[in-house]
Amino acid sequence: MLAAAFADSNSSSMNVSFAHLHFAGGYLPSDSQDWRTIIPALLVAVCLVGFVGNLCVIGILLHNAWKGKPSMIHSLILNLSLADLSLLLFSAPIRATAYSKSVWDLGWFVCKSSDWFIHTCMAAKSLTIVVVAKVCFMYASDPAKQVSIHNYTIWSVLVAIWTVASLLPLPEWFFSTIRHHEGVEMCLVDVPAVAEEFMSMFGKLYPLLAFGLPLFFASFYFWRAYDQCKKRGTKTQNLRNQIRSKQVTVMLLSIAIISALLWLPEWVAWLWVWHLKAAGPAPPQGFIALSQVLMFSISSANPLIFLVMSEEFREGLKGVWKWMITKKPPTVSESQETPAGNSEGLPDKVPSPESPASIPEKEKPSSPSSGKGKTEKAEIPILPDVEQFWHERDTVPSVQDNDPIPWEHEDQETGEGVK
């Protein structure tokens, strides 16, 4: 309904000569003041919600990684949140600014890089969801198995994702430029005659590579992972791991479904624009603008899904919030009491058993020189009876001290004495 209203206002207010132009960078000229106000306001609201949500998710993941070794799924979710945050920080404000103006005044570099950067982040998210689905299937196949993944493997996967994602939309960077049309400066996709066939092929393959195939493989792995979660384990520990695996699978599957549904209108508008015939109807600009808003709203929906559906993220959010509240700078009284308590805090740091310092002095074998030194240091007088007692004790053979059956020897000694 709102899109239809936008379409009516745009068709009546927009210059008919602009209909055949392929705009870029979010530039859509229109004389409708309502259209210029509502779309930027929606984008600002999406940015605020998504910014707070993604910061919470990133803070929780970094806090968990600081406490222990990061997992592959957590690293991929972190990559997803970073891509969302990048879109909300760098792309959505530019889109809102471009929508609010009838002339392009954001510069040549922003015109060339705007669409490329958006599609790079979106393709990176799409590829990340595929890898998440694969890892989720591996985890669901054997939840009790502890998989150790090196940091090198995690970094290699992330670098590969961003490299492929940045190369796929590269033609948009090449052919987006600023042009003057009827005295108005615009950001357009200007394809020369030599590259028309190549760009026609790009317009068909890019949606398949960035959206169609990743969605197919992600659905395949999520379906297999969910099928594995239906098999009940026999042991209590396996059942607990299986329940957790099912929760993770459902959460990540929800991320994939919501992302696909909110991204689908943008692909409809994109294909419509890229395959527009000379005499064919142009897509309504209200539909194009709303499809962009829905695409950016994915970045706000993802952190909400994580925080609502994952108990781990909710507990992590509580832990981070508690850590932020309880972490206060030491007061003057506490800083003055610290030196006095240092002597009591040192024994808590017990050295390792392998080190010589871990053996207390009272348990070390005493030598005559050390015993003499301690006696002289203490200056305690030795009585004659005590000295004779220790002298007789030292002269007793060590075999009797270590005799496991001393009662038999005592009987023998007693018998010899009677004889």
Curated annotation (Swiss-Prot):
It is a multi-pass membrane protein. Residues 330-419 are annotated as: Disordered. Glycans are attached at residues 10, 15. GO terms for biological process: G protein-coupled receptor signaling pathway; positive regulation of immune response; regulation of synaptic vesicle exocytosis; response to acidic pH; response to ischemia. Residues 410-419 have a biased composition (Acidic residues). The keyword Membrane applies. It is found in: Cell membrane. Disulfide bonds join 111-187. The chain crosses the membrane at residues 42-62, 72-92, 117-137, 154-174, 202-222, 253-273, 287-307. It comes from the Eukaryota. GO terms for cellular component: cholinergic synapse; plasma membrane; presynaptic membrane; synaptic vesicle membrane. Residues 63-71, 138-153, 223-252, 308-419 are cytoplasmic. Gene3D superfamilies: Rhodopsin 7-helix transmembrane proteins (1.20.1070.10). The keyword Cell membrane applies. Pfam families: 7tm_1. Residues 1-41, 93-116, 175-201, 274-286 are extracellular. Belongs to the G-protein coupled receptor 1 family. This is G-protein coupled receptor 151. The lineage of its organism: Eukaryota, Metazoa, Chordata, Craniata, Vertebrata.
